[in-house]
Swiss-Prot record:
One example of a Gene Ontology biological process annotation: viral DNA genome packaging
Family: Belongs to the herpesviridae TRM1 protein family.
The UniProt record lists the keyword ATP-binding: yes
Function: Component of the molecular motor that translocates viral genomic DNA in empty capsid during DNA packaging. Forms a tripartite terminase complex together with TRM2 and TRM3 in the host cytoplasm. Once the complex reaches the host nucleus, it interacts with the capsid portal vertex. This portal forms a ring in which genomic DNA is translocated into the capsid. TRM1 carries an endonuclease activity that plays an important role for the cleavage of concatemeric viral DNA into unit length genomes.
Compartment(s) where it occurs, according to its Swiss-Prot or TrEMBL record: Host nucleus
Provenance organism: Saimiriine herpesvirus 2 (strain 11) (SaHV-2)
Protein's gene: TRM1
Keywords of this entry: ATP-binding, Host nucleus, Late protein, Metal-binding, Nucleotide-binding, Viral genome packaging, Viral release from host cell, Zinc, Zinc-finger
Location, primary (coarse class): host cell
Zinc finger (C3H1-type): 180-208
Subunit and partners: Associates with TRM2 and TRM3 to form the tripartite terminase complex. Interacts with portal protein.
Cell division found in the keyword field: no
Protein name: Tripartite terminase subunit 1
Molecular functions per Gene Ontology: ATP binding; zinc ion binding
Organism lineage string: Viruses, Duplodnaviria, Heunggongvirae, Peploviricota, Herviviricetes
InterPro entries found in the cross-reference section: UL28/UL56
Length: 679
């Protein structure tokens, strides 16, 4: 079934890519007969597949099925919009892209937690959905499954609205500097070197929510298209290559005239040999040399775009596509790129202009000219100076002070100044190179094209499946025990009295603390790898991903301490397990911790006192849907459902019971295990 679903997805994905391109094409050049045929086919596929996808996603969702449902729905709407606005060419693009309509990418969804605690979640970009998923995962035990599913379905609908039909999300619908949960997991695998998590996440470039694509060469593709149609494109490259530096030309010509006086029959003098070597080794720089133009590289790129636009008239006259009618301003084209150039070309042009502006500064030009060894040595040779430095005559130390004059002092000062400026120049060039590389990477990450990633769909599907499985599990054929029976109350009191005088060993407390942490770790942070993380680390990842404040972690660590006694956790109420009475979310969360702590510690003490082996499971352990399952397909033990109506489900030997009181459940287990032991 998954293979068939993937095959349908690949075909629909390819069609949505073509349709997304059609939304920018001149409608006069679209074959509307083909569009009409494809619309009819999509309508048939929609009627056949959409109900099945809807049913599947309400039983057990997958990121593939949810995204396919979105693509089919959006594709049908876009094709219908094509047909509706085909006749109005003047308003075609405005209607297709809803340019005059108010922004529809804002959503406010209300989630109702226990005890009618309502929280409004506002969303406008893709990252908001990912952030919401992490936060709901950290408080999954504070909400009923039915209420969570109602809100999650609204979130998925909003995600489908943002998804559209194009594989490329709109640039204003995501931010690449907001880390997702996968970015967090990757950074957790690396040593933090003493830095906090927020500082590590400051310079993150998320590639999971929207995948970054490597830039591809675009320049030259349109020229090849023109050449195939025998249209010659004028190029200025040959002119640029023939331009050379005038100073280097003069030096080269003068050097060659000096060497013309030397013949093969003469002995080679040191100046002649050095002059010949310098001309030889500087030949590469001579070929690359070009006059510095006043036009920047960015201006050249923009003029290249305009030039290629003029050549479009040779292919199709009177063509008006979306970018002809809505042209970006020059400053906007830096961020959106061009039709005939890539973002990589834009980044290279900006780096080149920054470097050129730095090098044009007068002090750097002068110092770089002085540092050019070839230039200095050639000038000395052409001026007739001897290249071999003569050793200065030895002067007694006592006579040095007498021959020092003010001119030499000034000369030394200028020499020190030049040395200092050369050092500053060297450091400045190094800093310039580092800055260009760093900012170039930032520009590439910001401006490069990205496509939809799978992170958001994976996270929202995991959350939805968790609440689906919870709802399915409590809806199975369980036996509901009487809620307010006198016998149940006495049984509960018996177990409480039994364990109240006992105490857990301090060695046992540490393992129980990890079990408690595991039961409150969200479904997005559950470790199913071959090398799972410890429960405390997994919970820390869950809270860090949700952005929990430090004092929340402190409160968690204070839930269980080494000297804890039954009087500290045993509730005095009857039949009120997981009955939340708080009205704000923080208090609801803490109250849920108390109930889960009571379950872990009481069951452990019960096993220790009565030598039982009763296990505790949770709804987090379900890896597939629970539809049409029976009690005999579950392991024996206590299942924590996090639902206030059916918080505890006790499965024992092919039967299952729903309890609202933990100690009545333990007494029931004591009876069943005693009978089996007696037989």
């Amino acid at each position: 079934m998954a293979q068939h679903l993937a095959a349908v997805y690949s075909q629909i994905y390819g069609l949505t890519l073509d349709v997304s391109i059609l939304t920018f094409v001149d409608p006069a050049h679209i074959n509307w007969k083909t569009v009409t045929k494809n619309t009819e086919k999509i309508n048939k596929i929609y009627l056949q597949i959409m109900p099945l996808l809807h049913n599947q996603n309400n039983i057990e969702s997958t990121s593939l099925s949810v995204e396919l449902q979105h693509l089919l729905h959006n594709l049908k709407i876009v094709l219908e919009t094509f047909s509706a606005h085909l006749s109005d060419y003047n308003m075609y693009f405005e209607n297709i892209h809803s340019l005059s309509a108010p922004c529809s990418r804002h959503k406010s969804i209300v989630f109702q937690f226990y005890n009618n605690c309502c929280v409004s979640v506002k969303m406008c970009i893709i990252n908001d959905i990912e952030i919401f998923s992490k936060r709901l995962s950290s408080v999954f035990y504070c909400i009923r499954s039915c209420d969570a599913l109602r809100g999650i379905n609204h979130v998925i609908d909003f995600l489908g609205h943002l998804r559209g039909v194009s594989p490329i999300p709109l640039p204003d619908t995501y931010l690449s500097n907001i880390p997702c949960i996968y970015c967090l997991n990757e950074h957790m695998m690396l040593p933090n070197q003493g830095e906090s998590l927020p500082s590590l996440m400051m310079c993150v470039n998320c590639k999971h929510v929207c995948k970054q694509l490597n830039p591809e060469p675009i320049q030259g593709m349109f020229e090849n298209e023109l050449l195939q149609r025998h249209i010659i494109v004028e190029s200025n490259k040959q002119k640029e290559q023939n331009q050379t530096c005038s100073i280097d030309n003069q030096i080269r010509d003068a050097s060659l005239s000096k060497l013309n006086q030397h013949t093969i029959f003469e002995n080679i003098s040191a100046p002649v040999l050095e002059l010949s070597n310098l001309i030889y080794w500087s030949s590469g720089a001579h070929k690359k040399c070009a006059n510095v133009e006043n036009t920047s590289e960015m201006a050249k790129l923009l003029s290249y775009e305009a030039k290629m636009q003029n050549y479009r008239k040779y292919i199709c006259k009177n063509s008006t596509h979306f970018f002809d009618k809505y042209k970006p301003y020059p400053i906007e084209s830096i961020f959106c790129g061009g039709i005939f150039s890539s973002v990589d070309d834009t980044v290279k042009s900006l780096k080149s202009d920054c470097s050129l502006a730095f090098m044009k500064r007068a002090n750097y030009q002068q110092l770089i000219k002085k540092q050019n060894e070839l230039f200095v040595r050639l000038n000395k040779i052409l001026q007739g100076e001897d290249t071999v430095s003569h050793a200065a005559s030895a002067v007694p130390l006592s006579d040095k002070a007498t021959i020092v004059n003010p001119d030499q002092v000034l000369h030394d000062a200028h020499a020190r100044k030049d040395a200092y400026l050369q050092k500053v120049t060297k450091d400045g060039l190094k800093s310039l190179y580092t800055c260009l590389e760093t900012q170039g990477a930032v520009l590439s990450n910001t401006l490069s094209m990205r496509v939809w990633g799978g992170a958001v769909y994976d996270e929202i599907v995991k959350l939805k499946n968790h609440f689906l499985f919870r709802d399915q599990f409590i809806s199975l054929d369980w036996i509901h025990c009487e809620t307010d029976s006198v016998t149940g109350f006495e049984n509960s009191k018996y177990i409480k009295n039994l364990i109240y005088s006992q105490k857990l060993s301090s060695e046992h407390i540490s393992s129980l603390t990890l079990q408690f942490y595991k039961l409150i770790t969200g479904p997005l942070s559950q470790n199913v790898s071959f090398f799972p993380l410890p429960s405390n680390i997994a919970l820390a990842h869950c809270l860090d991903a949700a952005g929990a404040l430090p004092h929340h972690k402190l409160l968690l660590t204070e839930m269980i301490w080494p000297s804890i006694e039954p009087k500290d956790w045993v509730s005095q109420t009857y039949n009120k397990f997981y009955t939340i009475t708080s009205t704000d979310l923080n208090s609801i969360q803490k109250e849920a911790w108390f109930f889960i702590r009571e379950l872990v510690l009481s069951v452990s003490l019960y096993n220790e006192v009565l030598e039982k082996n009763l296990l505790v499971f949770s709804a987090l352990n379900f890896e597939k849907n629970c539809v049409n399952l029976s009690p005999n397909q579950f392991c024996s033990g206590i299942y924590l459902t996090y639902e206030d109506s059916s918080p505890l489900i006790f499965v024992y030997e092919n039967q299952g019971w729903v309890f609202k009181d933990l100690y009545a459940l333990l007494y029931h287990h004591l009876q069943l295990s005693g009978k089996n032991h007696g037989t």
